[in-house]
Amino acid sequence: LAAWARENEIWLVAGSLPTRVTGESRLHTSSLVYGPDGSLQGHYHKLHLFDVDVADGHGHYRESASFVPGEQWCVIDTPFGGLGLSICYDVRFPELYRQLRAAGASVLLVPAAFTHVTGEAHWLPLLRARAIENQCYVVAANQCGQHGAGRRTWGHSVIIDPWGQVLAEAQENVGLIQAELNPQFLKQIRHDMPVLNHARLRSGWREPE
């Protein structure tokens, strides 16, 4: 991964990946961020584990049987803005994304393996909501296809702007999507509708001058 980032001179977000936990038989579900020089710029361990029942061929999902949750949110500073890291089921917990926004995120990253059932119903509405309420770009890459044990994932990887508009979307297949992120557009939206300044349930949040 480091070599790919270095050879192509890109920022690379690799997630999610299983990573070892010292003293634990279980693993973390993690995202790793590499800079264009190949250096590891930061990592995030998934906070919210998917222990749910879904009306699909798999039925019972118990992520905690194999994984332990992380303890800390993460924003990575880059030349094009802060990258707020999250993974899959995290997207159902808006308080995480508000924290990422308050910590300087302008792009929210959501690598995922949303099931076909939950994805068809909730994938796009949840992602658009996180983009709109936090006035951030959202880049969400979702697994697709039929897997073992009756599991099927939704695909439809997507890029969304801070106004909630879909800039690019894949279908239920493997593919490549891209979109241009406009810092001035993001700045204008935050200026015109300063939601952090209006938030009353948490104190001390102000839009940077």
Q: What are the functions of these language-model segments?
A:
Residues 1-14, 82, 88-177:
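CN hydrolase (nitrilase-like) catalytic-core segments centered on the catalytic cysteine
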Residues 3, 22-103, 116-119, 125, ...:
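Active-site catalytic loop in hydrolytic enzyme cores
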Residues 14-16, 30-33, 74-76, 157-159, ...:
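Short beta-strand scaffold segments in enzyme catalytic cores
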Residues 17, 45, 143:
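Histidine-centered beta-alpha loop that forms part of the nucleotide-sugar donor binding/catalytic region
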Residues 19-22, 146:
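Short glycine/acidic-enriched loop and turn motifs that connect beta-strands
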Residues 36-39, 79, 162-164, 181-184:
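Short loop segments at secondary-structure junctions
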Residues 50-58, 176-178, 183-188:
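Short, surface-exposed linear segments at secondary-structure transitions and domain or protein termini
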Residues 184-209:
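A short C-terminal boundary segment appended to hydrolase-like catalytic domains
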